[in-house]
Amino acid sequence: GYNQYGELGTGDTEERKIFTQVKGPNGEGILENIVQITTGYYTGYALTTNGEVYGWGSNRYGELGQGSKSDDPVLYPTKMKKVSNIIQISSGAEYIVMLDAEGKVWGTGYNGNGQLGIGNTTLQTLPQQMTSISGIKEISAKSNNTYMLTEGGYVEGVGYNYYSQLGDGSSTDRTTAVYTKNTSNKYVSDAKHISAGENSVFISRKKDSEGNPQGMYVIGRNDYGQLFTGNTTRAYYATEVEKEKDILTMALTEGQTGL
């Protein structure tokens, strides 16, 4: 694929028409012992078995977490500074968020909509801990939004909110995390998994007390009917859909959804 910014991690900026292995740090060998990967606009990231994060490609906004930013691409995987014991990674457009084993969330890179959740819109070149949150067990980022699922089944969101995709009933960007509400204006508290889309989010629900499926919640942009609501109206709050189904996996992209 496209490789102008070295986002394929092959040590150069030449496009590839067949799969090519990502090189190791400093171009030595290949990148190994990987348990998860994620990609930004022009950046690749990998999480290792020992909780380290490596990034390569564009570092224009400090999204590689090296303490600096540059228009020059980083051609080989480089270890993210300041973080350890990471168990999940998720990247937005030009930033990344990372969940550690203690339930804390860290982020670095572009922050123009507050998507790093640190109370401001200043870009960061080193990972910073998200403020006012704890007990997080799952994260999902897309474009300029970050979502967190708590151990208790609550959902929090931060960042861009023009399409009301944070589910707090407003269209105001948030620089600190807010709880997602349902159409009864109560906090969502039965979430099982989360998946961020382009200005929307899907939340699969736990089964009820009798073991019955409850489907999922959808929030945000709906120009193309991607929220399964049968219309193209924006969802300001978490809206119930597919209620009789037990949703196992969700995949979202711009204007399209798969379950």
Where are these regions (language model features)?
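Eukaryote-biased RCC1-like beta-propeller repeat architecture
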Residues: G1-L259
